[in-house]
A protein has these predicted regions:
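Extracellular/oxidizing-compartment recognition motifs
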Residues: 1-395, 404, 420-423, 436-439, ...
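Active-site core of glycosidic bond-cleaving carbohydrate-active enzymes
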Residues: 400-711
């Protein structure tokens, strides 16, 4: 039953609800009295009042559900008539960020408890400004489309109530929607100014390139990865930008108020790696084209806009006049290269940050510069990745990954004392009636997301159960365990056919993921992977505790003993066994992370394996010598380094924990002001799980309820 809207119904332009990358504007004129806007939309929206940006959204939900935002418009209103514009882009492609669902907007404005404008009654006009270029490449494999626009200065009048050259369209009512309340807080959209210009120079266009880099999101468009095929694109953004030749002339400038460009570029630096909507004002006496290229770091002193396999290059064709540019979706960057073909003046370069509000608690840190820098970086990392659910990264994917969420959830409780985002995140897994393209019982590795290729990570589904137990302990929400019971037992039922004669999971399907290291290599994760089975035993134990199931508890205990007997070689736990004609044989693969799994999952403890424990504590970690245990492959940040630090914390080795923490994270905090996916800047440089650093610091030093000054 719809309890969120009194009159509004979902609408879209007639015949266009399934159109890919379709941007429309919905406009209403209201009086200047207190007003509240309620809306839900697919895929993403932004709201303007009298030409000024108000907010963007929505919060994401499971397939077939849509969360409703309630926005107070009163502060933006003036006396007399006011123009409210809601822009919505419907992507209609599968991704890990937004769902492949038809475009719609349901919106109504309440004033004095009465509806003064509502979609479906004619008070919201539907328009196409014909500025967004639809046929562009995907932004990444995990996200929908990159951005390219043909902006006309006259159309800015549309946001103030004039015609502006927009085409009014006939609307039609869409299928009825199921609505949910937005439980997570609205972002605050704090502006972040460019700090300085790090390089300027000239640029030549259309310079032949020997070998163009082309990502799968560009070349593999089809039923499994929806988008516009390369031969149908209006703009080939990544190809075009690879034909630019840069000639640096100046390497630094402090004045960023106005940047004059003519067939030239300027590379700007933000104070830290940030996520949000990139904004600027561009004035040009004649038509010109502006390109925005960006990344989280500089690679060999320059912006590599394809480093993360994203298309971090957007294009704006501008006519003569003044243009206010704002990206429609949020992006992540520390470095922005602005290039102009033709002449223009660029000013007011800034980002409207799209992140969780400032946390309620801060950590009572000692006066240590390194710890403060790490904590500040961790807070930024958390805020950028905990908006409406727990994301892996705010850049390439913006996806709600399991396992990552186990760690980020601890940070939320440390910083806010609540589990609001975690509940919304976990609830999405329960709301879905089924997970299309996945086998019965299996949970998606990230959600809400579309997995048309049928891929999943069996390990990550197990982490759902581990997080479920911690969520219930943190929140006291025991009813949630009952809501999740069918999911948990469905998962256990899924794994049952993979148990071999020893009770070990063997030859699991799809992406068996241990961590980003040698432990993930194909010859290590199959056929019987011991870290995976350690996790399985822990999952069974937790399910047994949650639901009072003694059979699961007994099964877990037996499995742990089997792993100890078959994996441990007298010095280390080995990673796997392979099935041969003679049965299971151990090839002797050993990884550092396997040892951490053993201790974290309860397979091992320091009482039974004291020598191994001392080796891990004293010889491994960030200070590990190059010639130390050469047969043991090193761990990476995700998740080995974090399991190591957690084990040190649980063992009460605070001094050692802080020492390792500084060695791991100081280089990250100093370089980007955020914490990374890997121990090197080879992937995402703002990864949500990395904020778990704050959990340990909060446990060690305590927290106090105050505005966090370092974010």
């Amino acid at each position: 039953m719809n309890t969120f809207f009194q009159k509004a119904v979902p609408i879209w332009a007639k015949g266009r609800a399934d159109e890919m990358n379709c941007e429309l504007a919905f406009r209403a004129i209201i009086a200047g009295q207190d007003a509240s806007l309620h809306l839900a939309a697919s895929s993403i929206y932004r709201v303007w009042v009298n030409g000024k940006f108000v907010c963007a959204g929505p919060a994401r939900a499971a397939h077939g559900f849509y969360r409703v935002d309630e926005i107070d418009l009163t502060p933006q209103l003036c006396a007399g008539q006011n123009t409210v514009v809601i822009e919505v882009t419907a992507f209609n492609v599968n991704s890990y960020d937004t769902l492949d669902q038809p475009g719609f907007l349901t919106a109504e404005i309440l004033q004095n408890h009465a509806v003064t404008a509502a979609t479906g009654d004619g008070s919201f006009g539907v328009y196409d400004l014909h500025q967004r270029i639809q046929r562009v490449q995907r932004y990444s494999f995990q996200r929908a489309f990159a951005e390219a626009y043909r902006l006309r200065a006259c159309k800015q009048a549309f946001y103030l109530g004039s015609d502006g050259g927009a085409e009014r369209l006939e609307s039609e009512t869409q299928a009825e929607k199921r609505y949910l309340r937005r439980e997570t807080p609205m972002p605050q959209f704090e502006p972040l100014q460019v700090q300085r210009i790090v390089q300027t120079g000239s640029v030549s266009f259309d310079v032949p390139c020997d070998a163009l880099r082309k990502d799968r999101a560009y070349t593999q468009i089809g039923p499994m990865l929806k988008g516009y095929p390369a031969d149908t694109l209006e703009e080939h953004l990544s190809d075009e930008a690879q034909t630019f030749a840069w000639k640096p002339s100046c390497h630094a400038a402090e004045d960023t108020a106005q940047i004059t460009l003519e067939n030239s570029y300027a590379t700007c630096r933000f104070p830290y790696n940030a996520t949000g909507f990139l904004c600027m004002t561009v004035e040009c006496a004649q038509a010109c084209t502006v390109y925005l290229l960006f990344d989280e770091i500089l690679t060999d002193g320059d912006v590599d806009f394809l480093r993360l396999t994203n298309c971090n290059c957007f294009k704006y064709d501008l006519d003569a006049g003044t243009h206010r540019i704002m990206t429609f979706a949020p992006y992540t960057m520390m470095y922005l290269k602005i290039a102009a073909k033709g002449a223009c003046r660029v000013s007011e370069v800034r980002m409207l940050q799209y992140q969780h509000p400032a946390p309620e608690f801060q950590i009572r840190l000692p006066e240590q510069k390194q710890l403060r820098e790490i904590a500040d970086a961790a807070v930024r990392t958390y805020r950028q990745n905990a908006l409406d659910l727990f994301m892996d990264c705010p850049s390439r994917e913006r996806a709600g990954w399991l396992c990552d969420s186990f760690f980020t959830a601890r940070t939320e409780h440390a910083l806010t004392g609540q589990c609001t985002v975690e509940k919304a995140f976990l609830e999405n897994f329960l709301l879905a009636e089924r997970f299309a393209h996945l086998p019965d019982g299996m949970l998606p590795m990230c959600y809400p997301a579309d997995h048309y290729d049928g891929n999943f990570i069996p390990n990550w589904a197990m982490w759902f159960v581990l997080e479920l137990e911690e969520y219930i302990k943190r929140s006291g929400d025991c009813a949630f365990a009952e809501r999740a019971k069918s999911r948990v037992y469905g998962l256990i039922q899924y794994f049952a056919p993979f148990e071999n004669e020893y009770g070990l999971l063997e030859k699991l399907e799809k992406w068996v993921f241990v961590e980003w290291s040698r432990a993930n290599d194909p010859d290590v994760v199959q056929d019987v992977n011991f870290p995976t089975n350690m996790l399985y035993a822990r999952m069974l134990q937790i399910a047994g505790r949650l639901y009072g199931d003694s059979a699961l508890l007994e099964k877990s205990q037996k499995l742990q003993e089997t792993i100890r007997q078959r994996s441990f070689n007298g010095l280390f736990f080995t990673d796997n066994e392979r099935r041969t004609a003679h049965g299971l044989e151990n090839p002797g693969n050993i990884t550092e992370v396997c040892q951490y799994y053993a201790f974290f999952m309860g397979t091992a403890d320091k009482r039974i394996y004291p020598e191994l424990w001392q080796t891990l504590v004293q010889k491994f970690g960030p200070h590990r010598a190059a010639d130390c245990c050469p047969d043991v492959a090193p761990a990476n940040a995700f998740i080995g380094d974090y399991l190591r630090l957690e084990l040190l914390y649980l063992d009460g080795q605070t001094e050692k924990l802080l020492q390792d923490l500084k060695e791991y994270f100081t280089p990250m905090a100093e370089r980007t002001g955020t914490l990374w996916e890997h121990d090197q800047p080879s992937a995402s440089c703002c990864h949500g799980f990395a904020s778990h650093v704050l959990y340990w610091l909060a446990k060690i030093y305590g927290t106090e309820k105050t505005q966090y000054a370092g974010a």
